[in-house]
Amino acid sequence: MKTLSTEEIAKSYGGRQVVKGVNLQIEQGEVVGLLGPNGAGKTTSFYMIVGLVRPDSGRVLASGHDISNLPMYLRARSYGISYLPQEPSVFRKLTVQDNILAVLEAQQLSWEARRTRTERLIEQLNLGHVRKTRGYALSGGERRRVEIARCLAIEPAFILLDEPFSGIDPIAVLDLQEIIFGLKRSGIGVLITDHNVRETLSVTDRAYIITEGKIFATGTPGELGRNPDVRRIYLGENFSMD
């Protein structure tokens, strides 16, 4: 079982420590949330796991291997860590099919293997009806599915999702949640950071709550929802998953 974890990662900006020794772990086949108030350090922690930010101290580990100093492309190539940014990442002037093929050009695959994998991803993400549609003409939900298909093109062990529920309508949210459940069933580990708390907790097996740069609490969605301290500092007293 592959794992993605951190050991005491820390980060300071301008003399202010924003992450203070964060420890977390994700295994293949589980969905984990990384949540917390604005300014709590969750985004910086997430970016250190992704490879966008280098920790000042501590380590990011892929199945025990220190990847703290590896760039994103080597984390993807060597350890199967894929990243979906919050910002739109599709090529606007390419069709859905060509968007997926473009990612596969970097893989050591024959043309036929690339075409076969593209067809499988189009079917898996229910994109057949828009395969010839260019990126700029996609809806928010369709664009998200194309972006996830591109993440899956490298056959990752882990997918890191940055604000995946941002900017899409309620129907697309439900669609995306089903896709995340499908990723879990296929044995992919998923780490989500998002401001949409209910949508995120609805798909997670467990979550970490960060505040003031430290892990404040961890548990299942039910455990966190019943935790009076978590409700006080983050969820609010009237929080409900209903």
Regions found by a protein language model. Give the residues of each.
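Conserved ABC ATPase "signature" region
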Residues: 112-130, 178-181
